Amino acid sequence: MKIGVFVPIGNNGWLISTHAPQYMPTFELNKAIVQKAEHYHFDFALSMIKLRGFGGKTEFWDHNLESFTLMAGLAAVTSRIQIYATAATLTLPPAIVARMAATIDSISGGRFGVNLVTGWQKPEYEQMGIWPGDDYFSRRYDYLTEYVQVLRDLWGTGKSDFKGDFFTMNDCRVSPQPSVPMKVICAGQSDAGMAFSARYADFNFCFGKGVNTPTAFAPTAARMKQAAEQTGRDVGSYVLFMVIADETDDAARAKWEHYKAGADEEALSWLTEQSQKDTRSGTDTNVRQMADPTSAVNINMGTLVGSYASVARMLDEVASVPGAEGVLLTFDDFLSGIETFGERIQPLMQCRAHLPALTQEVA
């Protein structure tokens, strides 16, 4: 099973709590995180894109770096780990994304890929005057389908004459082309999102579910497998989890309860409000899960809370789910969390037993 790190491009990572570590996103922090992840044989690093935060006492995600420029910098200071940036497709023409991706392919020596997102938080785009109207909620995957076709044309042949409802290319050129086939990833949980991934993505991200219920996402992975079978493609699921680990189950649980007790209710209210804006995409979208009150303090990603042995066992359970090809991990404290994962958790995981021995620790 592949392991990736979801780097904290926004302030405070993924804990919406006054009791969680409070920090700003910087290149130096993310450089240290990704170099440490590479040292511990993580397979990939992904950054999101967020253009407006949730506010509240913690100013959650009010402070964000930009994904492509951050990952270009990280590509230059790593050598093995795969690097993925996220394109907010309403903000960037596909021909520009194609050229930026080809540039980072050159920087990284063929280790780069692109995560495509349609955009769900209306204020991110209204503030710039580029929100296309609420009809977009129901047409966003039509838009993304045209977008990715332009990308594939330009990466594959260096030229596009695509004509569609959203994009018109007239002998559009991009050169040099990527040195290896460019991977495209998506994070669709709705039927429309999974249908898109089944046709165009190399793999699909989905949320884990619940606390210490590592296989609860299995129905989502099964839906993705079924969608991919209909297109004749192999599109695996990569599952998002937060790891909160300590020497004992009780110690880890105490940390989790402490974070929940400090939940930033004002920021969470903003998330809930935004999740209700899309009345056209159904009830199975990512943002609906993010705003579920069950575990909103970490946007309802699956949460693994326990001793190092308990977390290792639960991750092996994740690997046993049909269609689950990888996990994307976040941590309450990224630097210490990755080190603890590499030293204390990963060596206990049967699904990672193939890894070579560690070299000297990264500085």
From Swiss-Prot:
List, alphabetically, the InterPro entries matched: Luciferase-like_dom (IPR011251), Luciferase-like_sf (IPR036661), Pyrimidine_monooxygenase_RutA (IPR019914), SsuD_RutA_monooxygenase (IPR050172)
- SUPFAM superfamilies referenced in this protein's UniProt entry, alphabetically: Bacterial luciferase-like (SSF51679)
User: Which GO MF terms are attached to this record?
Assistant: alkanesulfonate monooxygenase activity; uracil oxygenase activity
Q: Which residues form the signal peptide?
A: none
The cross-references to Pfam families, in alphabetical order and at most eight, read:
Bac_luciferase (PF00296)
Induction annotation: Up-regulated by the nitrogen regulatory protein C (NtrC also called GlnG) and repressed by RutR.
Q: Which domain of life is it from?
A: Bacteria
Enzyme class, broadest EC rank: oxidoreductase
* Residues reported in the UniProt entry to bind FMN: I49, K50, N115, E124, R140, Y141, S190
Tell me, what is an example of a GO biological process annotation in this record? Answer: nitrogen utilization
Question: Catalytic activity annotated for this protein?
Answer: uracil + FMNH2 + NADH + O2 = (Z)-3-ureidoacrylate + FMN + NAD(+) + H2O + H(+); thymine + FMNH2 + NADH + O2 = (Z)-2-methylureidoacrylate + FMN + NAD(+) + H2O + H(+)
Alphabetized, the UniProt keywords read:
Flavoprotein, FMN, Monooxygenase, NADP, Oxidoreductase
Listed EC numbers: 1.14.99.46
- Its biological purpose: The FMN-N(5)-oxide reacts spontaneously with NADH to produce FMN. Requires the flavin reductase RutF to regenerate FMN in vivo.
Q: What family does this chain come from, according to its entry?
A: Belongs to the NtaA/SnaA/DszA monooxygenase family. RutA subfamily.
Q: What is this protein called?
A: Pyrimidine monooxygenase RutA
Origin species, per record, is Escherichia coli (strain ATCC 33849 / DSM 4235 / NCIMB 12045 / K12 / DH1)
